[in-house]
Amino acid sequence: MKEPDDQDTSDGGRSGSRNEGKLAHKSILKSSQDTTADSYTDGEESYLGDDLDLDDMDESSHSSQEYVQAPAPSQEPPVEVKEEPEADVKKVLSETFYYDYPELVSIPYVSSEERIPLYFLTLNHSFGYDCRKRANLQLLDSNTLLYVAGNQMVLLDFKDKTQIYLQSSSGQGIGAIGVHPKKTYFAVAEKGSFPKIIIYEYPSLKPYRILRDGAEKAYAYVDFNNEGNLLASVGCHPDYTITIWGWKEEQPILRTKAFSQDVFKVTFNPDNDEQLTTSGSGHIKFWEMAFTFTGLKLQGSLGRFGKTSTSDIEGYAELPDGKVLSGSEWGNLLLWEGSLIKVELCRTGMKSCHSGSINQIMLDEGEVITAGSDGSVRIWDFETIDTADVIDDTGLLEIEPINELHIDKSVNLFSMIKMNEVGNNFWLAQDANGAIWKLDLSFSNITQDPECLFSFHSGPIAALAVSPLTYLMATTAMDCSVRVYDFSSKNPLVHMKFKQGGTSLIWAPRSVSVSASQIVVGFQDGVVRVLELFDPKGLTVYAGRKKIPDAELHLKYVFKPHTDEVTALAYERDGDILATGSEDKTVFFFDVEKEYKPIGFFNTPGPICQLMWSPASHPEKTLLIICENGYILESLCPTIKDVDDQNVITFAIPNVFLRCFHFTSVKSKILRFLEVQRREQQKMLKEKEKLERRMKLAEEREAFGEEEIPEEETSEEGEEEEPPLPEIFMPPTPSPILCGFYSEPGKFWVSLGNYDAGFLYHCQFPSYLHNSDFQKQENEPFDFRVLENTEDNPIRNITFSNDQTMMFCGMTNGAIRVYVLSENDPFLVSLQHYWHFNVHDNNYGSIKSITSSFDDQYLLTAGEDGNIFVFDIFSEFIVPKGIKAKVPSPRFGIESEAAPEDIEDPKAYSIENARKKREHDKLMKKVEELKAHKREQIKILRNEFWKLLELNKELPAHMQFQRTDFNIDAKIHAEIHKKTSLKIEQVEKELAWEKQKHELGLKKLQDRFREPLESDTIVVYATQSDHQIASYRLVKPSKYSKLKRPSQSERRQSKMERLEKEGPGKKESQRDTGGSISLQEESVLEKGKKFRPRTLSEIMVENQIEKTKKLIQQAERAQFKILQRKKEWEELYKSKPDDDYEDPKDVQAIKEAQTYMGDFNLKTAPDYKIPEHMRINAAKKEEELGYLDTMAHGKKRYMNKCILSLRDLKLAVIEEIQCLVQELKNIQSSIPASKHMPIPQVPQIYPEEVPERRFQYDEETLLRFQRKQKKRQDKSSSKQSGTGSGGSAGGGLVGFLKLSSGKEGDLTTRDSLSRSSKASALLELPKPVEFEKAEPSDAELEIMKRDEVKHLYMQQFLCNRINELTVTFDAELHLLRHQKLKLDTKMKLSDLHHLTLFQEMLLLKNFEKQENILQERVNSLDKEEQDMQWKINETLKEMEEKKNEITKLQDQEKALYAGFQAALGENNKFANFLMKVLKKKIKRAKKKEVEGDADEDEESEESSEEESSLESDEDASGSEDDVFDDSICPTNCDVSLFELALQLREKRLDIEEALVEEKKIVDNLKKEYDTISKKVKVVATNLNAAEEALEAYQREKQQRLNELLVVIPLKLHQIEYMEFGEVPEDLSGTLVFSNHSLDRLQERIVQLQEENAKQQKLNKECRERRKLLIREKREMAKTISKMEETVRELMISKFGRVIDLEALQTLSVNTTLEELKIKKLRKELSNAKELRMWEEKIAQVRWDLMMKTKEHTKKLHQMNDLCLEKKKLDSRLNTLQNQQGNAFQGLRKADIVAKQKVTELVQTQLEKITALKEEIELLRKKGGLLLPPITPKPKNEMKPMDT
């Protein structure tokens, strides 16, 4: 990144805004501080020079070079650059400097300008619009639009619809455009390798500035800041670089990578140029220009979606306060604050703001405008959005738009821009579905409807065709439209919409339509439509109208030959046959003359991409079929036969003549062949050079006359190894064939893509082989033509001019290439020179169609980028342009023709499939007829068989045939049964899914409608009356009904309750934690000591310690007992109430009694205070509601059980009556008819009494239901099949229910019959026996009379029994009915109460949130008050403890002085001195405690500066004259007293320091107490205010509850409010008082009377008790005084004086003495140990002494011997000397010195021995004082003696 070093002086004066000033200042600071490679240094060239080199290398514009070297004459020279020594040099551009447009833009490439002019094609007009390109609609002024069309920018005047074109400079496309805020400049960001951004001035359209090196491949978006001095750009893949430009200086200011995925947009914040925003694929990022220590940087913060789903963000807007409002894919608005989503905005009901993505968001005049893919523009309130915030966990906030404009459901708004028209609020909108709209967003009563200014194709253009007669062209695309244009007059004429997208198109030749009015279009669903174009002005229908369209399209024919998209259409050269090709691998032929009657089709080995009939020069009519997968077929023209369609079974053409060429890749062979040729040419050149060199050498030899010249070594180059030839390569996937054309009969040229691109291949069909397999066939082309620069850019389409001298090629990258050919050159020998120019977009603008006009004056192209271009072809003849094309006149009678029925269903049958379906239906019809005939025959045979069976039954038994005799063959029956079972299994398998589906459906219905029911309505009828009783229809209680919210249902405890529950021991455990921890640590240490081995001394010491501990513990227990007793006395005295003490509870009770005495406070009273236990909330009310429902449900369930029991009783009664009636019938058969009593009618069961049987069914019921349903469906029409089936289902259900009830009746009858038979069997009735008639005897007559009497009695008994059963049942029913009526009344009251409770619950829920807030505040303040009160109590306790400690320390200090005074005794003359020593103040170093705090560090620093640990100071009480020295004990002063004074002084200082510390702690505690007390008062005030607020809110809630209407039924005797003895009409002023409350008040009177008598009795008893206690107190006082006197006498008798018994009890041991004893014991043990050690050392030293003595003795003996020998030698020597002369006399000096040394050594050793003996003696004594050994220093070290 390169940054400017200084600012342009011309611009610097004009920039006055705050942001620009900041930016310039930061840039200067950056340039002055940054020394990285991005900034300029001395001697480094500016990037302009580098760019010039690159431009020169790329053969691009030379304007920059001219700018550096010499300016053009038309340009003003740039401002001269002042060169300063040792300073950076920077080019400064003048404001009047412009680049040269002709030298800047890209120009066509011409291989040879001699044959082809440079401007062979000139852009005439653009009919397309890349509507899916982001921000591809800009407004330059009120009439001019700017948008990108391929490699051009189009300036469109939408008033007169003229166009101006600006060509790109790179020739590789344009990425983005942006307009200056002042509309004086616009930026064009291009594509290519390191593309440029060119700033054009408007309206002059001069290139003003060029920005370089901002992206690697292409730009995605550019945007000017609000002031227009900065430009932001963002690149596409792969770098995604965001750059901030100072565009007037052509300098990049900041640069960084924006993101790692596609970035859609970058914009400046309109209110702050230092903030930017980018958005793109799955992200949004917020940028800020920050000044860091390394300079000005661009820092980005990536937006975090959090819980929100990640979304691609197309549109956003920066709000003035720094927030950003963005859209989302699902249509909601996201409000960003910082880098987080603050809130997600949606519409009411959780509906999205737009149905689809939001593509643009704008701020305009305090409103937010959003445009979405749903075709709607919505206006939102800015303040609502700016202040939006989340209200719940969903993160959503519901808002509604202020205004809304819905354009159309087929509109997809991609971007919008406002028109600057005064007084209007017009906007231009880019529709991604192919339109530019003008919208009026004023939303007033004169608002205009949306106006479509321009309409285009949306997306890639699929096909283009031109009229063979005039300047008309037709296009189609996947946007389901067909459009016709007049490209000569530059006007779109007409367009027509369909349901499916168009994929191919052809204009019918004049041989088909003389007026060239027919257009054939193929669609993606396989349909082919023939459209007729005509001029409607010639119709009589439009006669007299003013606005008549220029052209109309009429659907003439429609047919569907294919099942997939139609990819190719071709008319035979005579126009007799139309051929269609498709992706479904079929070619279909139609007879054009017979209204496109289908001829037939055949299959191909691959999807078809092109069809071409042989030209007229070929002898035969053949069709060239090019498939995508490498197959090229040739078919003869099919013969047209007059065959009736009804007789044709299939349209497949049999025995079709096909020749196939299966293309095999030969590119690697061609490359190998070309390489071989190149090497051969190189060899030939080398040989030629060798020959020339030899000839030259021969000439030189002749010139010099030399005979032989050595030959040059020329074989070096030949000996070099050549690289290997390219390998033969076959691509794994065959290369697709893109296009092709005939050259000669049986020969053709093809262009391929992928690997085989770069050549045109000349191929020839092999000879025809019948039944050959195309898959196994492999063919290679026999010739090829090399195409320059098409390795990665193959030819997509090829067309020729009418005279075949120009070949127009449409390239894959959107370029046009024109080859100039010779006449009659089918082999393309002259394919060398060409004209090449990029027109469409290089990335996605592949040319789909290219064709010339009928007279070769125009060339038309259509690309996948949605652009349609018309070019003027260079011609030597001047042809008039702009002539309006003639639209064909309408045919006669066209207006009266009925339009054919269109095929709109994409799943409709194709022609072949429809024919197959028809044949299949015919076949199935014949099969069904045959089956019906067979069934009729079988039916006849079956009837005959049944007749035979009937005849067989009529025969006698012995003559009848058995059923098995009719079986002809058992195997046949077994086989039939087997097949039947297999068929059943198969059917079950086939219907398993349906079965499970219906079972699940039934289960779901039952779960939905029957499962929730606990009991259905059961109606029980009486038998002898019309009375009936119905049960309740109950739903099962929900499992969630009993749940409650414990946090809300719990009532806040009152203060009294809390105080009672807490008790005195609250938080005491917090105190004891430290002690418990320390005890635990001590126990751990003690456990650790057990593992160490103990010595005897340790055991003795521990025993002594244990004894002392026991004594101390005994004394501590006594002391603890005394203290406990004192504490109990203190508590007892503290609990003693004062004489005027009153119990607070009694006071409160008396106060409440006085307040509410004689007053029953109503809830409607304004001062009504709700007690805490009566406060209600939503949860409690919900519990009441649940309890009421439970109670009502329980009562209803109990009543249902009773009714069900009654129903069961009726069933039992009916069963018994049926048995009795059957028995009655049997009895009446035995008595005369005259004595028959009428048989009682048996009660019947109604369907309402057994509703559960409605859902019981059997197979017969289901079959009947199916038959009924089928009949109803047959009767209903096909259009009303849905409603009809529903109605039939309902009717069937009713019939099914009726059938079910009938079946139940049968079952009941059957059951009754069975029961009657059982009853008769039990009664053992005599069966009638048939006898022959005879005269009865007298005995028989007597028996008959007796039986008759018996039967008559039984008849009467049975009738009575039946009557009794019915009457009893009816009585039970009446009784239960009466109970149910009462329960119904209660249930109605319950429902009314339920309604009231529900209303109260809803009201309480509204109050719940605020109440919870107030309650939470009260609870928090209450808890805070309790905590502070506890802190106060704790502080008071600590203060009391510290005061006790201070008192103890003061007592210790007094005791210290008293003890020292006693030690001094009387008349001690050093008393004053010693007292001064004791009282002297000394500065001591502060002791570092183990458990230090934060202040110890400072104390340690201060103590480290002290010179010594003790430093004397003067006594404060004395004067300066009283200075004395306390370091030396005075003469005659007792040393022990002096030492005691020093020790006690240390103790005094310790006590004083402790006192100071304790007083500091007390002061701190007082301060803390005061602070907390103040806080308690504040909290108490706040608590009272909060409780009052809560109480007021409770009153408000109660008042709102009182406003609810409650229904209370009253009887007249309950009304006691009478006026003149009558009930008044208006009862609004009455009070409804419950009996329960009234009874309670009356009971309260009795209770109070009883309580009064009880209290009087208790008062009397308390007075008697008080008198008794006073008497006992006097007696106890006398007893205590007697006991005190006895104790005093005992003390005097035992101790001689009165002593302190407590001190005596606590006196156990003298701890100091015991400690000294333990120290003494330890010292003795250590001394004994040390004594043993010294004894061992003495023994060792004695041994060493003895050894040394022996050695010394030995040495002395040696010395003695040596001395004797020396003496002898001396005497001999003396003798010799005396003989020689007496020169020397006496001993030598050396001998004297040696002798003295030996003597001293002996003396020293003797002294050591004496000292050691004394020390040994001393150590042997017990109490001897051990002194250091005497080691006398030797004066001189012993030197070795000379021998």
UniProtKB/Swiss-Prot annotation:
One of the Pfam families matching this protein, by short name: WD40
Cell location: Cell projection, Cilium, Flagellum; Cytoplasm, Cytoskeleton, Flagellum axoneme
Regions of compositional bias (Acidic residues) in chain numbering: 41-58, 705-724, 1492-1524
GO terms under biological process: cell morphogenesis; cilium organization; flagellated sperm motility; microtubule cytoskeleton organization; nucleus organization; sperm axoneme assembly; spermatogenesis
Cross-referenced PANTHER family: CILIA- AND FLAGELLA-ASSOCIATED PROTEIN 43-RELATED, CILIA- AND FLAGELLA-ASSOCIATED PROTEIN 44
Organs and tissues of expression: Expressed in testis.
Family from the record: Belongs to the CFAP44 family.
Free-text disruption phenotype from the record: Mice are viable and show no malformations. However, homozygous males exhibit complete male sterility due to severe defects in sperm mobility. Sperm from mutant mice is characterized by normal flagellum length, but most of them showed abnormal forms and irregular caliber of the midpiece. Females are fertile and give litters of normal size.
Region of interest (Disordered), ranges: 1-86, 701-726, 1040-1086, 1266-1291, 1488-1524
UniProt cross-references to PROSITE patterns, sorted A to Z: WD_REPEATS_1, WD_REPEATS_2, WD_REPEATS_REGION
Biological function: Flagellar protein involved in sperm flagellum axoneme organization and function.
A Gene Ontology molecular function term of the record: peptidase activity
Name this protein carries in UniProt: Cilia- and flagella-associated protein 44
SUPFAM superfamilies referenced in this protein's UniProt entry, alphabetically: WD40 repeat-like
Composition bias, Polar residues: 29-39, 1072-1081
Keywords tagged on the record: Cell projection, Cilium, Coiled coil, Cytoplasm, Cytoskeleton, Flagellum, Phosphoprotein, Repeat, WD repeat
Major subcellular site: other
Modified residues (Phosphoserine): S1069
Coiled-coil residue spans: 1548-1603, 1631-1665
Keyword Repeat: yes
Spans of repeat WD: 214-255, 258-297, 308-346, 353-390, 456-495, 497-541, 561-600, 790-829, 842-881, 1699-1744
Basic and acidic residues bias spans: 1047-1071
GO cellular component: axoneme; motile cilium
